[in-house]
């Protein structure tokens, strides 16, 4: 195992340990704040899995988050379907993946890459948000849909109700940990190696026998499916869904979370989302108008001081201490 993998697993283990002990020191409100931040972290990790491994930026990624949220809401809103929560989650994942498969097929097999891909996905996000506003008979229009029930299911004869703060926090934290670890395993395996080769030189990768458009499509679909899962979890915890969840603002914010946390690290975007969401909650409680300015300053500082994101701090400190030891 190379040093980079050991560092990642060590940071992951520390974060998991902190997530386990956090409920012992937090009240209900703090648990809900971190729970929601973890969901956004899962959303950020889904974008990073595609953007970080392929180098192609999807600027409308919130569309998949919103699609997942609306599908979850429509399936569970009346609370009349048996196993509604499970069907809602499966429907959200499948719906987001289906839309990504259709769009991605024409883009990747049509040779659309780089800034052109970014522009097309930006338009996709705008279209999805406008559809959510205009299709008011289904989506509720500008007001969205409210009264979405929390996730409920039976596990080994025990009924689990995620309307409470602690169970919902544990459930979300477990989902995020498992998904991030699974994505990291994929990224560090042969699939991730081929994606890196495609990112470096797609023509050369194709000459070696790799079907680059298909690889990119599958990665894009998996990324969208996880974004749909995050959207489904969010609307169940929040109890509502609105067009803003598929809008340009959220698509921009998730890019910032990934950049702040560290693109290509998967765990970094989760930490970036938690850091920014927590900072926003704290600062906005004192002066809401101050937050956009501070966010811009934080982003500029990260770009110049920590271009690899906050997750690179550990590696930098480790290298610094090693350098001092050698100097002595």
Tell where the protein language model's regions lie, with residue ranges.
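Transmembrane alpha-helices and adjacent helix-loop boundaries
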Residues: 1-328
């Amino acid at each position: 195992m190379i040093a980079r993998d050991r560092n990642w697993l060590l940071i992951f283990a520390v974060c998991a340990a902190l997530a386990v002990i956090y409920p012992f020191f937090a009240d209900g409100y703090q648990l809900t704040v971190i729970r929601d931040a973890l969901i956004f972290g899962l959303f950020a990790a889904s974008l990073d899995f595609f953007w970080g491994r392929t180098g192609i930026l999807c600027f409308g990624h919130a569309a998949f988050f919103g699609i997942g949220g609306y599908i979850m809401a429509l399936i569970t809103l009346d609370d009349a379907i048996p196993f509604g929560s499970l069907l809602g989650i499966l429907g959200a994942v499948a719906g987001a993946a289906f839309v990504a498969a259709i769009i991605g097929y024409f883009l990747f097999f049509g040779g659309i890459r780089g800034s052109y891909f970014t522009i097309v996905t930006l338009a996709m996000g705008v279209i999805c948000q406008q559809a959510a506003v205009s299709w008011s008979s289904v989506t509720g229009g500008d007001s969205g849909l409210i009264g979405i029930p929390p996730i409920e299911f039976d596990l080994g004869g025990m009924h689990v109700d995620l309307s409470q703060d602690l169970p919902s926090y544990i459930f979300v934290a477990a989902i995020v940990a498992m998904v991030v670890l699974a994505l990291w395993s994929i990224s560090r395996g042969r699939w991730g190696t081929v994606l890196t080769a495609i990112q470096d030189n797609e023509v050369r990768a194709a000459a070696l026998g790799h079907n680059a458009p298909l690889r990119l499509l599958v990665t894009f679909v998996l990324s969208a499916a996880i974004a749909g899962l995050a959207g489904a979890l969010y609307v169940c915890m929040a109890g509502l869904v609105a067009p803003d969840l598929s809008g340009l603002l959220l698509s921009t914010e998730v890019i910032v979370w990934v950049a702040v946390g560290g693109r290509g690290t998967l765990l970094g975007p989760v930490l970036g989302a938690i850091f920014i969401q927590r900072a926003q909650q704290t600062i906005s409680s004192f002066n809401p108008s101050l937050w956009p300015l501070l966010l811009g300053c934080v982003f500029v500082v990260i770009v110049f001081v920590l271009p690899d994101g906050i997750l690179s701090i550990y590696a930098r400190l480790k290298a610094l201490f090693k350098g001092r030891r050698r100097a002595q």
